[in-house]
């Protein structure tokens, strides 16, 4: 008999908080439990933090449960106050609509929209933007205690700096989302990141207050290092799933260079590798862990960008470590002859300013074709660009410079 999917996710160290664990496990064993995960369209691409949730959704779907991917076109107009210290800039409807279309395409790569338990994309703008305020406050607002809401961590941290009533409405709207999906699609489970716990329990409790005892929720852990620092940040910013924002090579290199103590967690949360295989790969130390890192980098890149791009990234990475592969797949930037080394470093994304670039050179962290750069006044000449020219930052940052 296959292990219950909730227990498997627990064993992988993914689940953190939950409502009514024993009954949820029972429901998941008895048949298809439609579930939903929400994504706010506040950027035109998903990032690695979103993918943790999509992996959980993928696991649940593979176990026979139907995913509802909720695009928060309505709630994004307010903005979730969780983890925020100030009021988010409100997006225009046009911005949100553009982002929703791009995100829909990305999500479709990760969950299956065909079959008996096919995934479905819904947008809460469809039911939130035309709500009658008086009816909503009477039917939904009456079920929420302001005292209890203010005790929630997401609101408590904002009280000192100022919390608007506009933002307080976020919990009610997210809770209403669950109720709407429960009524329309039989959705019985909401999942989300552990920073969403206050908002997530609101929906399940609302449904239960209305007389239904089969509403459940659980949160998954955010992707963090052993020290508790969020993973997924690069020198250029977030680790995006859009290859135009983060190239497959840069994406691969991020996971190839993950810290030794984080490899096991990354493999558990971001791949489908069996736990016994992960244990075997990570039971070693030092240089022997490189095999696990390469497998993690390849598997995660394959899941996001496909096998062909993963192979290209792997080859480019091997080339940079002197194993004779082709450099053709390396990130490339076009520059004009006589560009200064400082500007080249900035264009490559290795520094945000000339001051930072100077510091990197002073620390011996910049090389051109493996020759350490020491001259702050160095210019990239046309002769240099006529041959292969590799700019490196330390052991982890690489790009090829070509003539514009």
Residue ranges and their predicted role:
Residues 79-83, 131-137, 229-235:
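Short acidic, glycine/serine/threonine-rich loops at helix termini
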Residues 30-38, 67, 175-184, 225, ...:
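Short, hydrophobic/aliphatic alpha-helical segments
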Residues 207-404:
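Conserved nucleotide- and phosphate/pyrophosphate-binding catalytic cores
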Residues 81-97:
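A charged helix-plus-loop insertion that forms the helical arch/lid used to bind
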Residues 12, 92-93, 99-100, 104, ...:
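Divalent-metal (Mg2+/Mn2+/Ca2+)-assisted nucleotide/phosphate chemistry catalytic cores
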Residues 53-60, 181, 199-207, 300, ...:
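Buried hydrophobic packing segments
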Residues 1-35:
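Positively charged, low-complexity intrinsically disordered leader regions
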Residues 23-81, 190-197:
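N-terminal catalytic cores of NTP/NDP-binding nucleotidyl/phosphoryl-transfer enzymes
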């Amino acid at each position: 008999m296959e292990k219950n999917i909730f227990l498997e996710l627990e064993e992988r160290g993914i689940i953190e908080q939950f409502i009514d664990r024993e009954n949820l496990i029972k429901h998941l064993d008895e048949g298809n439990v439609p579930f939903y995960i929400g994504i706010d369209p506040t950027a035109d691409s998903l990032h690695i933090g979103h993918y943790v949730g999509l992996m959980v959704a993928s696991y649940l779907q593979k176990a026979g449960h139907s995913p509802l991917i909720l695009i928060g076109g309505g709630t994004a107009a307010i903005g979730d106050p969780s983890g925020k210290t100030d009021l988010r800039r409100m997006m225009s409807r046009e911005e949100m609509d553009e982002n929703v279309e791009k995100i829909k395409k990305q999500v479709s790569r990760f969950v299956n929209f065909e079959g008996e338990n096919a995934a479905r994309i819904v947008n809460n703008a469809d039911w939130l933007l035309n709500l009658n305020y008086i009816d909503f406050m009477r039917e939904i607002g009456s079920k929420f205690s302001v005292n209890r809401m203010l005790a929630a961590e997401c609101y408590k941290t904002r009280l000192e700096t100022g919390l608007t009533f506009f933002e307080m409405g976020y919990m009610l709207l997210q809770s209403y989302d669950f109720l709407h999906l429960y009524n329309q699609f039989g959705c019985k489970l909401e999942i989300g990141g552990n920073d969403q716990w206050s908002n997530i329990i609101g929906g399940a409790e609302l449904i239960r207050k209305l007389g239904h005892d089969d509403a459940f929720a659980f949160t998954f852990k955010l992707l963090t290092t052993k020290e508790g620092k969020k993973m997924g940040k690069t020198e250029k910013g977030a680790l995006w799933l859009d290859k135009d924002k983060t190239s497959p090579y840069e994406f691969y290199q991020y996971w190839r260079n993950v810290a030794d103590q984080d490899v096991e967690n990354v493999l558990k949360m971001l791949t489908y590798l069996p736990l016994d295989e992960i244990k075997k790969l990570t039971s070693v130390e030092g240089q022997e862990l490189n095999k696990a890192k390469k497998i993690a980098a390849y598997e995660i890149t394959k899941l996001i960008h496909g096998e062909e791009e993963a192979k290209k990234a792997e080859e480019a990475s091997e080339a940079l470590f002197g194993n004779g592969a082709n450099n053709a797949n390396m990130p490339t930037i076009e520059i004009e002859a006589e560009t200064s080394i400082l500007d080249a470093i900035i264009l490559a994304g290795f520094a945000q300013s000339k001051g930072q670039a100077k510091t990197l050179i002073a620390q011996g962290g910049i090389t051109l074709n493996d020759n350490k750069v020491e001259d702050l006044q160095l210019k990239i000449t046309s002769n240099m660009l006529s041959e292969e020219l590799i700019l490196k930052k330390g052991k982890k940052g690489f790009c090829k410079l070509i003539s514009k």
